[in-house]
A protein has these predicted regions:
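Conserved beta-strand hairpin/beta-sheet module of binuclear metal-dependent hydrolase folds
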Residues: 56-139, 241-257
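Metallo-beta-lactamase
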Residues: 104-105, 128-134, 139-141, 145, 175, 194-197, 204-208, 220-221, ...
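Active-site metal-binding motif and surrounding structural segment of the metallo-beta-lactamase
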Residues: 118-179
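Active-site environment of divalent metal-dependent phosphoester hydrolases
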Residues: 157-164, 189, 236-240, 260-262
Length: 357
C-alpha cells in the first residue's frame, strides 16, 4: 500500500475542512472552493477527457432526490458512466486515469441488486430494466487504448464495485497490469470494516486486491494539470469527486447528486423537487441512499457546486455531471431530468505508443 507523495494538495480546502461546527464549515468551504478553483484553472487545461456510457439501471426513486420526487414509479433509471482522463503530472509525464471503470456485471453481487434480480428475475432486471451500452474493455478499445496504457483507477466511492478483475486478487489475474487504485483512506478503511447498515451496497470481497496496487489519499489531490480529485465525504465517508478543467470550463463528476438539477433544485421540473427544496430551504438535494453523514454530503455538494461553476451551455445550471446520470425511461414516468448537459469530452485521448509523437 502506498501514499501519494507525487500529488499536490489543492490550496485553501484543508484549512476549511478542519472547522468542527457544521454551519461554519459550510461557509468556510464555500469560500475555499472558489479560491481552490481559481488556482486550479490558472494552471491550464487537462490533456484530454472522454466520457463512456456503461449501463442504464434501476435505482430506488425514494433515494434519488431524498424522497422529494413525486411519481408512482418505484425506480428512477440512471446511466453509469466512466471518464477516461489524460493529464500531465509534475514530472511532465502524460498519465491515464479511469474514473469509475465499473465492472458492472460483478456489481450485481451487491446484496441490493442481488435481491432485485431475485424479486423480478434475471430477464426483467437485465433486459427490461437495464440497458448495456458498452464495457470498460470495449470503450478502451474504441479509444485505441490497451490495459497497459492505464496508470490509475479511481471511483467516486466503492458502492457496487468489484476491483478484483481489474487489479487481481482471489486467484484472478489483473486486467490492468500497471494501474494502481487511487482511493481515500477513509473509503478504504470503511470498505474493510463495513457496518451492517452499509453492507447492502457493497460487493462481498470486492476490495480484496493486492495492497501494493492501492494508493491511499488524504483529502483533496491535484493529480496534474487540469485534473484533481476533491474530497467530498458524505455519500460515503471517503467519497470523492473528479474535477477537470478544459480551456472553457470546469467539470465535476460524482454521485452525490443524480442530475445537475440536484444542485439547482428550484429549477427542477420533476414534480415535488422544487417544492421540497423551497420548503426545507435547501440549495442542493442529496442522492440519499445513505444517511450516516448527510450534513457532510450537503456541504460536499456545495463544494462541488462552487468548484464546477455554471455550465457554459446552460448557464442557469451547475456544470456537474453525475457518475450515474438520471435518464428518461418509460418505466420511470415524471422522473426524467429537466436538462442533460453535454457529457465531459475534450482533447484527444492517446495510446502510450503515440504519446511521444
Amino acid at each position: 500500500m502506498h501514499t501519494s507523495p507525487a500529488f499536490r494538495p489543492l490550496p485553501s480546502l484543508a484549512g476549511a475542512r478542519a472547522e468542527s461546527v457544521p454551519g461554519v464549515k459550510l461557509q468556510k468551504l464555500r469560500r475555499a472552493a472558489l479560491d481552490a478553483r481559481e488556482a486550479f484553472v490558472k494552471e491550464g487545461p487537462v490533456a484530454a477527457i472522454a466520457t463512456c456510457d456503461l449501463i442504464t439501471f434501476p435505482y430506488p426513486a425514494q433515494f434519488a432526490f431524498s424522497g422529494a420526487a413525486l411519481s408512482p414509479a418505484p425506480y428512477v433509471m440512471m446511466t453509469n458512466r466512466m471518464q477516461v482522463v489524460q493529464f500531465v503530472d509534475r514530472e511532465g509525464e502524460r498519465r491515464t486515469l479511469l474514473f469509475n471503470p465499473s465492472d458492472y456485471e460483478k456489481g450485481y453481487a451487491a446484496p441490493f441488486y442481488r435481491a432485485l434480480r431475485e424479486r423480478y428475475g434475471t430477464f426483467v432486471t437485465d433486459k427490461v430494466m437495464s440497458t448495456r451500452h458498452g464495457s470498460v474493455q470495449s470503450h478502451l478499445a474504441s479509444l485505441g487504448l490497451t490495459p497497459a496504457d492505464v496508470d490509475y483507477l479511481a471511483f467516486d466511492h466503492l458502492h457496487l464495485q468489484d476491483l478484483r478483475g481489474w487489479l487481481g486478487g482471489d486467484g484472478l489475474p489483473a486486467y490492468f497490469p500497471r494501474a494502481r487504485l487511487l482511493v481515500q483512506r477513509a473509503e478504504w478503511e470503511l470498505v474493510k470494516n463495513l457496518h451492517p447498515m452499509q453492507t447492502v451496497w457493497f460487493v462481498p470481497g470486492g476490495a480484496e486486491v493486492p495492497q501494493e496496487r492501492v494508493v491511499l489519499l488524504e483529502g483533496d489531490v491535484w493529480l496534474g494539470q487540469g485534473a484533481a480529485l476533491l474530497s467530498t465525504p458524505g455519500h460515503t465517508q471517503g467519497n470523492m469527486s473528479l474535477a477537470v478543467a478544459t480551456s472553457r470550463e470546469v467539470f465535476v463528476v460524482s454521485e452525490n447528486g443524480v442530475a445537475t438539477e440536484s444542485y439547482t433544485p428550484l429549477l427542477s421540473a420533476i414534480p415535488g423537487v422544487r417544492r421540497f427544496a423551497e420548503h426545507l430551504g435547501w440549495e442542493v438535494v442529496l442522492n440519499g441512499n445513505t444517511r450516516e453523514d448527510s450534513l457532510d454530503q450537503y456541504t460536499s455538494m456545495v463544494v462541488e457546486k462552487m468548484f464546477a461553476g455554471m455550465s457554459t451551455v446552460e448557464g442557469a445550471f451547475v456544470n456537474f455531471h453525475p457518475s450515474s446520470q438520471l435518464t428518461s425511461h418509460l418505466m420511470a414516468p415524471a422522473l426524467a431530468p429537466t436538462i442533460v448537459l453535454p457529457a465531459p469530452n475534450f482533447g484527444d485521448v492517446r495510446p502510450a505508443a503515440r504519446r511521444a509523437a
